[in-house]
């Protein structure tokens, strides 16, 4: 068993997540591809594969139990975060991964081809120009500097009835929540426990006021 495989098992044992052998293989395969492509494409500032396991894989998949619905979009996905790890963990759900940079979308296409991931649709577009045929149960992102930016840029993406925004944040700020536009409010703040990751992590659920 490789060091990364042992590290992964140790980290997962500290969570309530159930990960199959295939999912583990795909998640670690994604780390290997990210590490390989990163040298030429500069996809992430995290250079070390063992750090990627914590900061990219675990940090993404701890969100998995919080997902409800079938259709998700990851806006500003970068190299596929958190979308690829979440798609691996939820093969029955569909994930659209949106980014404006071609090199990132090319990388994601390579990942889904090599790892045989069938529930991801990569799209190169600016968020404000992307008009989906069908809206989403949830809009995910860890890319936006503020929740206000996220809901303003992505307001046209969630389902009107019950669609939500899921913002992956470090420290949760009441001040930032108070700055949200009038039509939107915080529905829930969940503390995420990421084994061996320093600093706070939160998942903030936002929705339009009914």
Curated annotation (Swiss-Prot):
Its main location: cytoplasm. Keywords: Cytoplasm, Methyltransferase, rRNA processing, S-adenosyl-L-methionine, Transferase. CDD domains: AdoMet_MTases (cd02440). Gene3D superfamilies: Vaccinia Virus protein VP39. It is an enzyme of class 2 (transferase). Its EC number is 2.1.1.170. It holds the Pfam family GidB. Belongs to the methyltransferase superfamily. RNA methyltransferase RsmG family. HAMAP family: 16SrRNA_methyltr_G (MF_00074). This is Ribosomal RNA small subunit methyltransferase G.
